[in-house]
Amino acid sequence: MTTETFVKDIKPGLKNLNLIFIVLETGRVTKTKDGHEVRTCKVADKTGSINISVWDDVGNLIQPGDIIRLTKGYASVFKGCLTLYTGRGGDLQKIGEFCMVYSEVPNFSEPNPEYSTQQAPNKAVQNDSNPSASQPTTGPSAASPASENQNGNGLSAPPGPGGGPHPPHTPSHPPSTRITRSQPNHTPAGPPGPSSNPVSNGKETRRSSKR
């Protein structure tokens, strides 16, 4: 003979559940994309209440106050709430009405903090991984200003060592010397004041001597 399970003993993932319960409420019908009608009903036994999801015509036949035997059901979590389903080959059979001892509390289909805490750490882990990923990004950004500082040091800091800025100036000096060298070549007349006088004097003496 099959053993009956109480509502209080239902856990997520259990299969082949056999229960006897009374229907307390029938919920609104919702249609799936496939055109099926789904109705959520609140049922209870003496240990507590739970929601059961019923499909199509069976949901239309169930009425509050019906005492039903469920065979081969299974339990799963839907939107954070424990829900009872009819499995493959399962059956819902009406065995009576009204005359059954039941308790609405505790309601095992209420959102369970254990399920939320199981989801919360996962989100926390993701949040932890995100800042860790953001930290390395800040690292290279800190390195980039360092490189900028190095570039700035290459230009401004070497004045401390002195030798750094001077080499660029030293190559600038040789061209200036070249220019000065070219200037005397082109400007023997440029400094004519001192040099032209003796030259002119020589010419004058030559002219005077020729005369």
Curated annotation (Swiss-Prot):
GO terms for cellular component: chromosome, telomeric region; cytosol; nucleoplasm; nucleus; site of double-strand break; SOSS complex. It is found in: Nucleus. Its main location: nucleus. It holds the Pfam family Ssb-like_OB. PANTHER family: OB FOLD NUCLEIC ACID BINDING PROTEIN-RELATED (PTHR13356), SOSS COMPLEX SUBUNIT B1 (PTHR13356:SF3). Belongs to the SOSS-B family. SOSS-B1 subfamily. This is SOSS complex subunit B1. It comes from Homo sapiens (Human). The lineage of its organism: Eukaryota, Metazoa, Chordata, Craniata, Vertebrata.
